[in-house]
Amino acid sequence: GCCSYPPCFATNSGYC
């Protein structure tokens, strides 16, 4: 998963 840090979480917000 790519939900550990803000930049990546924001990009995958609908997928995290």
Swiss-Prot record:
Q: Which PROSITE patterns does this entry report, sorted A to Z?
A: ALPHA_CONOTOXIN
Q: What does this protein do?
A: Alpha-conotoxins act on postsynaptic membranes, they bind to the nicotinic acetylcholine receptors (nAChR) and thus inhibit them. This toxin blocks mammalian nAChR alpha-3/beta-4 subunits.
* Record-annotated membrane-spanning stretches: none
Q: What is its main location?
A: secreted
**Example of a GO cellular component annotation carried by this entry:** host cell postsynaptic membrane
Instruction: Work out whether the entry's keyword set contains Cell division.
Output: no
Q: Which family does it belong to?
A: Belongs to the conotoxin A superfamily.
The record's region (Ser-Xaa-Pro motif, crucial for potent interaction with nAChR) falls at 4-6
InterPro entries (alphabetical): Conotoxin_a-typ_CS
This protein's name = Alpha-conotoxin AuIC
Task: Kindly list the positions at which Cysteine amide occurs in this protein.
Answer: 16
Entry comment describing in which tissues the protein is expressed: Expressed by the venom duct.
Give one GO molecular function term: toxin activity
Please report the organism this UniProt entry assigns to the protein.
Conus aulicus
Write out the entry's keywords from A to Z.
Acetylcholine receptor inhibiting toxin, Amidation, Disulfide bond, Ion channel impairing toxin, Neurotoxin, Postsynaptic neurotoxin, Secreted, Toxin
Disulphide bridges: 2-8, 3-16
